[in-house]
A protein has these predicted regions:
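Alpha/beta-hydrolase-fold enzymes
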Residues: 1-64
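Short beta-strand/loop motif that positions the catalytic acidic residue
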Residues: 100, 106-108
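Feature representing long, continuous alpha-helical segments
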Residues: 72-79, 154
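Short alpha-helix in the alpha/beta-hydrolase fold that links the catalytic acid
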Residues: 89-94, 102-103, 113-126
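Acidic beta-to-alpha connecting loop that harbors the catalytic carboxylate
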Residues: 110-112, 138
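Catalytic active-site module of serine/aspartate enzymes centered on a nucleophile-bearing elbow/loop
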Residues: 121-124, 130-184
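Active-site nucleophile elbow and catalytic-triad environment of alpha/beta-hydrolase enzymes
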Residues: 60-61, 76-96
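Secondary-structure capping and boundary motifs in well-ordered enzyme cores
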Residues: 7, 66, 73, 96, ...
């Protein structure tokens, strides 16, 4: 309800986006590069300065989210994520998971700064029957699970029991999906 916190949503997205990618990737892509034709050295206090390329990149992602996502809904989703606790009222994590009877597949990105691999191992160890954690090797941080399609494909194919090549998406289909995701 009420006015949407659009500026705050864009800023939150800028900050969050720095955790979706690894420091190594951001350094490789942007380093200390200035926007073309701009100097990042300001004259005096309060005088405008040029911007770094990373700032434009982050602004772009902030503006993109504001255009496609309701800011108040974003607040509600964030609250749900922050307050969720599978063990609440059930004791420890192991006690909460003790009666699960599904098959689990757990994967982690080695450079993820949102969901650290050790947390995935903790989850796997808390299951009634521990399962291995598949580690996705990526220089892309959290978004590695979106970018490292071949690794994720193998993990999912094994989990679904469709490890033969005919059951996996074709290269052309993967390229179409990648292009679609870039234009969203």
């Amino acid at each position: 309800d009420g006015p949407a916190p659009l500026t705050g949503l864009a800023l939150a997205r800028r900050i969050a986006h720095t955790t979706y990618r690894s420091p190594a990737e951001l350094e490789h892509r942007f380093g200390r590069e200035e926007n073309r034709g701009e100097s990042t050295v300001g004259g005096s206090l309060g005088e405008p300065r040029g911007r770094y390329a990373i700032e434009s990149y982050l602004d772009h992602h902030g503006a993109k989210l504001v255009e496609r996502f309701d800011a108040n809904s974003y607040l509600a989703v964030n609250e749900a994520l922050i307050s969720h606790d599978v063990a609440r009222g059930r004791g420890t994590l192991a006690q909460a998971l003790a009666h699960t009877d599904c098959e689990w597949t757990i994967a982690a990105v080695n450079t993820d700064r949102l969901f650290f691999p050790h947390e995935s191992h903790r989850l796997a160890e808390a299951l009634p029957t521990p399962v291995p954690v598949d580690i996705i090797e990526s220089n892309h941080g959290h978004d590695g699970f979106l970018i490292e399609a071949k690794q994720v494909e193998k993990i999912l194919a094994r989990a679904l029991g469709v490890e033969d090549e005919s059951a996996t998406p074709s290269e052309a289909q993967r390229e179409r999906e990648a292009l679609d995701s870039m234009t969203r």
